[in-house]
From Swiss-Prot:
PANTHER family: IMMUNOGLOBULIN HEAVY CHAIN (PTHR23266). One of its GO terms (biological process) is immunoglobulin mediated immune response. It comes from Mus musculus (Mouse). Pfam families: V-set. This is Ig heavy chain V-III region U61. The lineage of its organism: Eukaryota, Metazoa, Chordata, Craniata, Vertebrata. PROSITE patterns: IG_LIKE.
Length: 113
């Protein structure tokens, strides 16, 4: 059974920082690109960041709205992906999901700013 479990959400003040974590099980994590996606009433579903494989030197890509503020990383030995969020803004409020190539999704974690 595939599982993606996010944690680390919670209330944060504007300008603050937060780190989200997602632990995966049920598939070979190191073989999958991983993404963070967020959902809000105002913007709907919005892709946030992507991290590729070791063979791609863990290349990362970001939405323009978070570039320079958010950092995605992964630890294949722990089957985990992370999202460090700095200088948070009200518009960053949403439910944050980790996903593979959009085939598998976690349950989401709420980040109210």
């Amino acid at each position: 059974e595939v599982k993606l479990e996010e944690s680390g959400g919670g209330l944060v003040q504007p300008g603050g920082s937060m780190k989200l974590s997602c632990v995966a099980s049920g598939f070979t994590f190191s073989n999958y690109w991983m993404n963070w996606v967020r959902q809000s009433p105002e913007k709907g579903l919005e892709w946030v960041a992507e991290i590729r494989l070791k063979s791609h030197n863990y290349a990362t890509h970001y939405a323009e709205s978070v570039k320079g503020r958010f950092t995605i990383s992964r630890d294949d030995s722990k089957s985990s992906v992370y999202l460090q969020m700095n200088n948070l803004r009200a518009e960053d409020t949403g439910i944050y999901y980790c996903t593979t190539g959009f085939a598998y999704w976690g349950q989401g974690t709420l980040v109210p700013v």
